[in-house]
Amino acid sequence: MRRRQVIKLGAAAGVFGEALSRWAIAETNRLFEISLAQFSLHRTYYGEHIEKGWVHLSQLLREDPAAAVAGGPDPADFAMLARTEFDIGAVEYVNQFYFAQLGNEAYFKEMARKADDHGVVSHLMMLDGTGRLGAIDAGERGDAMEKVKAWMGMAQLLGCAMVRVNIEGEGEPEERAKRTSESLDTLGEIGVGMGLAVVVENHGGLTSNGAWLAKVLSLAKHPGVGSLPDFGNFRIGKDAEGKDIWYDRYRGVSQLMPFAKAVSAKSYDFDSAGDERMTDFTQMLRIVLDAGYRGYIGIEYEGRQLNEFDGIRATQRLLQRVRAAYSSNSHSRSGFVERADTAFALDE
C-alpha cells in the first residue's frame, strides 16, 4: 500500500473512531438496545399493491413511487409511530418508501425534526434500487456509487449513522469480491465527509454465503465499511428440483460479526412460548454478544402469522426476554464467534 493510501486510511480511522458512538448505543446497563426496521411495516405501507405481487409493486415504484405508499400511513411519521406504538427509540429507514422524495431536502429535515421531537434516534437507512456495485463494467459500478451517494445525502439530513447498501454483481466469485470491495472502499471514503458508515447485509444470492461476504469485507480496507448481519437472510439459491438452498444461519452470522456495525433480528413466526420458529434467538444473540457487539439490534418482522404490529411486538418481547436472561446470568464470552476465513465455498 502506498504511503498516501496509508495516511488516507489512517485519517478516516480517526474520523470513525471519534464518531463510533453514532452507531453504538450510549452507555447503559443493557447489553443492547432495540431499534425498528421500517420494512417490518411494508405491507402496512404498500397495502393492496403488495398483495398484487412484487412484480406489480416494483413497476409501480419505478413509474409512480408516490402512488405505491399513498394508501397507508405517512412514511414521514415512521419515527413517531415507532415511539408511540412500540416505545422504541431508534429506527432504520428504508429508502424505497421515499423514492418520490429523493433530493427533497426539506422533507428529510422535517423527518429529522419529528424524530428529535419524539426522542428517536435515526440509526440507519437501508438502500434499494441503487444499481450493482459488483458489476463487471466500471461505468455501471460508477453509476451505482453515484446513486448511493445521492441517498447518503438524504441519510445525512436525517442524522443517520450509516447506510446499508446492496452488492449485486456478476462474474466469478473471487473477481466479484474484489470489484465489490473496491466499490465499498470508495463509498466508505465518501461517507467520511458525511459522518456515515457503509454496511452490507446478507441479502440473497451470493451475499447470503457468509464466507463469501466475509471475504468481501476482509478485502475492503476502509474503517467505515462493515456488515449488518441478518438472522434470516441466508437463502443462497435453489437446487435442481426448485427447493431452497440455505446457508447455515448461525455460522453465517458468526462469520459476519467481526465486521458488524448493526444487527438485524429477522423474524417470521412464533410458537406458543413466544420463540421464533426459524431462528433460536438465544443461540443467535449469544453469537452477537460474544463478538463484543453492544449496539442496536433491529426488529425486522416479515411473517404473515401475525399482523405487522403484533409481529413487531412479539419480536420485541423475545429480544427483551433473552436480553434479560443474559443480563441476569452475567453474560460471559464463550468464544463462539468464527473469524472470517480467506476461503469460501458456494456449496455449503
PLM regions: where:
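N-terminal pre-domain/capping segments
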Residues: 2-157, 175-178, 185, 192, ...
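Active-site beta-loop-alpha junctions enriched in small/polar residues
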Residues: 39-41, 94-96, 127-130, 168-170, ...
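Acidic/histidine-rich catalytic cores of soluble enzymes
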Residues: 48-49, 90-91, 181-287
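Short acidic/polar active-site loop segments enriched in Thr and Asp
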Residues: 88-89, 161, 294-295
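Conserved beta-strand positions in the central sheet of alpha/beta enzyme cores
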Residues: 90-92, 124, 164, 264, ...
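A short helix->loop->beta-strand "cap" motif at the edges of active sites that frequently abuts
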Residues: 120, 196, 291-295
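Active-site groove signature of glycoside hydrolases
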Residues: 155-175, 194, 199-203
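A short pocket-lining beta-strand/turn micro-motif at the edge of beta-sheets
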Residues: 261, 293-299
